[in-house]
């Protein structure tokens, strides 16, 4: 099926700028966002997760994969998600996959999903809170679904439009994925950056080969569901691995694109 008018608009915006911001229910009208919110909030209620949140709020720096102590991952380092979960229904919905596949120009793989609570911390930006770009593939679509309202103080996702690999602004700043501090700010003043504040239910599509950062709240917290869509050439899919486990029968997915998305090389 051809993309709808709004889907085609998102694809075009991604091609031109590398980023598009919409409301989830405008793209996937049948999804009940409150069901996704309720599921996500329930994941935060375990004693271990609550203890970790309190630890960070009290100034602690608990051990974390990659050193990102400020991110609470209630699903663990390798998330396990039910195929029937409402959030997977959205992530593997035909409208979202039409957008992703339309942008990538091929069927895509769902390489990773995760639930992040970014807790407010003092001090300068660290790790992915700094400007960077993702090297895993020549084009990568990440979606960030805001599960709570996100304002300037909650660590909104930030992007430099046009710096994605296919975009009009070549990536010539530094040799590495993390430029030196201040380089991006000097080259791209605030007027050339996009700060993605938004209400709960906001869905950010972005090609993260472009410069981006986020997730450093100075007050409150940022709660998002993140999904990563790539080609077969991305790490770790090229090695026959995926960064999450899907619980349930893949055969229950009706869409060929959805079944392909959760498969691996050789399936």
Task: Give each language-model segment a name.
Residues 1-16, 23-129:
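Non-heme Fe(II)-dependent double-stranded beta-helix
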Residues 165-267:
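Conserved double-stranded beta-helix
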Residues 28, 137, 212:
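Glycine-rich nucleotide phosphate-binding loop and flanking beta-alpha elements
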Residues 22, 143-145, 204-206:
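Short hydrophobic-aromatic micro-motifs
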Residues 24-26, 162, 227-229:
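Active-site donor-binding loop signature of nucleotide-sugar glycosyltransferases
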Residues 92, 160, 206:
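A conserved hydrophobic position in a structured secondary element of the catalytic/binding core
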Residues 113-115, 143-145, 225-229:
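A structural signal for short, well-ordered beta-strand segments
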Residues 98-101, 124-195, 236-242:
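Catalytic core of non-heme Fe(II) oxygenases with the double-stranded beta-helix
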């Amino acid at each position: 099926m051809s993309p709808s008018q709004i889907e085609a608009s998102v694809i075009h915006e991604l091609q031109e700028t590398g980023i598009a911001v919409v409301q989830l229910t405008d793209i996937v009208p049948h999804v009940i966002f409150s069901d996704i919110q309720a599921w996500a909030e329930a994941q935060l209620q375990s004693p271990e997760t609550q203890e970790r949140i309190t630890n960070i709020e009290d100034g602690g720096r608990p051990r974390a994969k990659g050193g990102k102590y400020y991110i609470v991952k209630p699903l663990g380092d390798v998330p396990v998600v039910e195929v029937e979960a409402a959030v997977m229904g959205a992530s593997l919905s035909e409208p979202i996959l039409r957008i992703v596949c339309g942008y990538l120009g091929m069927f895509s793989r769902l390489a990773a999903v995760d639930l992040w609570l970014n807790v407010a911390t003092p001090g300068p930006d660290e790790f992915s809170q700094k400007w960077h770009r993702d090297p895993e593939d020549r084009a990568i679509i990440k979606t960030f679904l805001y599960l709570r309202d996100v304002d300037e103080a909650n660590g909104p996702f930030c992007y430099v439009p046009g710096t994605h690999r296919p975009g009009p602004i070549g990536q010539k700043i530094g040799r590495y994925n993390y430029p030196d501090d201040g380089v991006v700010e000097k080259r791209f003043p605030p007027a050339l950056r996009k700060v993605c504040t938004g209400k709960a239910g906001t869905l950010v599509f972005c090609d993260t080969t472009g410069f981006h950062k986020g997730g450093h709240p100075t007050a409150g917290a940022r709660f998002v569901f993140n999904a990563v869509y790539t080609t077969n050439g991305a790490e770790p899919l090229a090695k026959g691995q995926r960064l999450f486990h899907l619980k349930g029968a893949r055969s229950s997915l009706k869409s060929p694109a959805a079944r392909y998305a959760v498969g691996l090389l050789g399936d």
